[in-house]
């Protein structure tokens, strides 16, 4: 299965294991709660998917790379205690609480989340002294004499033997107590993730052309050569940072992330062309409507006579440019929605207040609440950014109220309502701007490539992009729907032709 399918399966498992009856007791037998074992090549997102599941399900996450641990840190340290057996006092050995189990309790105390995921990475690469402990952990859900708390799903990940010489094979007894999921690299699934994560446009365009360059791991007598999903994502971040700083991108830099010479060389050439075509075609000005009609016609002729690679890179540039606009709108939409929800609370808060100084009290409460949730690690970066925007907006509202000498709550809230209406209008203007950009992009694609494979790639790129799909679902886009219908008709026609051909062969 691919990593997306594995993610859904983990979410379903978490829900199943943590079902409760009316008395609040867990209904799934603890003995039958098999740990999940993800097996797959390195760098395909096994660790990242655990973070996503924990965040989306609102549970805690404790992650360990077990190769960094000794038997003592996993099981606990021995200590001598006195016990009385059959009237005779004896000294016996007990173990302190495992560092890993202690981390689970720390997470519960820090975040207030009583349920979660305990994730152990590289579990099949443990040292010889720790191997029996890991088998006990998978079979009995314990480290030493200490059990994993109820409500916590055990998940582990490892690499197949062909990727890691340190791998220890699990026996049948152990495998019969876990849910093994074999994960494979899948470019289509990663591309959906890539649009969400704003992966560099040159990478998306390149992988659209060279699908077989997405993932490659090879061990030869000359050394190890590999390109992974993690490598592409990390490369994207350094490219964006270097471009903002004006630092030159070199082939050596690419080779530090894509450890296979022919792929690094091929991508570097494509990256240079991507930057060059971005300047030559001026697609930012085209999307914004700043490009004159005569200049547009020149760009159309340039694209009509372009090579296969140039056509695909131009399509990638258009998709990347639109994605930036979709992200801007999505951020604005979330911020506007968050402010709206806060104003509903503010209205109730001001109901029995005498004057608008209560707005500052309300804002202070918000600040304290944010600080508590940040300390408990209950917010991700995106949620934190939105919360901070809401607080800044409330402070701006308060400043405007004071500047205009408004004191009574009724007049003050009405003024805030007017200020919020301006925010809503700004969001509407942003949506209209993006709709026009979409129309210009489709018009350019149609003029350059008609209904060719480049247009198919363009429509497919929008469909896979969750930001684009959400925007089009809300505001519509006639050219997109028209092209999608044509593509669907073509698929149905091709399927019918294949069925007819198969019948004729009978």
Stretches with model-predicted labels:
Residues 1-212, 220:
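AAA+ P-loop NTPase catalytic core and its hallmark functional loops
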Residues 2, 98, 171, 186, ...:
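Helix N-terminus capping/helix-initiation residues
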Residues 4-7, 11, 20, 32, ...:
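Context-gated lysine
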Residues 5, 9, 103, 189, ...:
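Exposed alpha-helical structural elements
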Residues 10, 100-104, 242, 434, ...:
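Generic hydrophobic, helix-prone segments enriched in Leu/Val/Ile
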Residues 17, 26, 64, 85, ...:
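Sequence-level detector for tyrosine residue identity
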Residues 301-506:
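Terminal-proximal interaction/regulatory segments of ATP-powered molecular machines
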């Amino acid at each position: 299965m691919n990593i997306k399918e594995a993610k859904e399966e983990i979410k379903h498992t978490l829900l199943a294991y943590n079902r409760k009856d009316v008395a609040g007791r867990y209904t799934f037998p603890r003995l039958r709660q098999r740990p999940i074992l993800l097996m797959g090549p390195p760098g395909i997102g096994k660790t990242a998917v655990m973070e996503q599941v924990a965040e989306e399900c609102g549970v805690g996450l404790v992650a360990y790379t077990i190769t960094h641990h000794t038997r003592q840190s996993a099981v606990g340290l021995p200590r001598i205690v006195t016990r009385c057996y059959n009237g005779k006092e004896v000294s016996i050995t007990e173990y302190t609480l495992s560092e890993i189990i202690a981390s689970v309790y720390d997470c519960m105390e820090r975040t207030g989340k009583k349920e979660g995921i305990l994730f152990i990475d590289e579990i099949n690469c443990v040292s010889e002294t720790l191997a029996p402990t890991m088998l006990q952990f998978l079979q009995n859900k314990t480290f030493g004499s200490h059990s994993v708390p109820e409500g916590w799903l055990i998940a582990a990940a490892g690499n197949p033997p062909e990727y890691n010489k340190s791998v220890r094979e699990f026996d049948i007894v152990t495998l019969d107590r876990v849910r093994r999921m074999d994960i494979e690299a899948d470019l289509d699934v990663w591309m959906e993730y890539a649009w969400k994560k704003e992966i560099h446009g040159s990478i998306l365009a390149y992988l659209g052309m060279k699908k077989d360059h997405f993932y490659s791991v090879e061990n030869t007598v000359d050394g190890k050569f590999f390109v992974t999903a993690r490598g592409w994502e990390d490369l994207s971040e350094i490219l964006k940072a270097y471009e903002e700083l004006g630092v030159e991108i070199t082939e050596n830099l690419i080779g530090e992330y894509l450890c296979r010479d022919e792929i690094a060389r091929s991508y570097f050439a494509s990256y240079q062309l991507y930057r060059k075509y971005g300047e030559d075609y001026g697609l930012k000005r085209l999307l914004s409507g700043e490009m004159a009609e005569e200049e547009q016609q020149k760009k159309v002729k340039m694209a009509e006579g372009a090579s296969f690679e140039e056509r695909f890179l131009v399509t990638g540039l258009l998709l990347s440019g639109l994605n930036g606009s979709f992200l801007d709108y999505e951020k604005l939409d979330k911020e506007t929605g968050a402010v709206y929800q806060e104003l509903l609370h503010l209205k109730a808060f001001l109901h029995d207040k005498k004057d608008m100084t209560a707005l500052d009290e309300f804002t202070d409460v918000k600040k304290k609440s944010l600080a508590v949730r940040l300390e408990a690690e209950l917010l991700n970066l995106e949620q934190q950014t939105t919360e901070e925007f809401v607080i800044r907006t409330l402070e701006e509202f308060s400043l405007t109220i004071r500047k205009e000498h408004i004191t009574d709550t009724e007049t003050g809230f009405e003024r805030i309502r007017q200020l919020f209406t301006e925010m809503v209008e700004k969001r509407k203007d942003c949506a209209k701007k993006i709709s026009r950009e979409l129309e210009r992009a489709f018009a350019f694609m149609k003029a350059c490539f008609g209904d060719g494979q480049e247009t198919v790639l363009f429509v497919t790129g929008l469909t896979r992009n969750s930001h684009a799909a959400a925007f089009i679902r809300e505001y519509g886009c006639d050219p997109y729907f028209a092209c999608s219908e044509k593509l669907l008709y073509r698929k149905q026609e091709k399927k019918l032709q294949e069925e007819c051909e198969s019948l004729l062969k009978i």
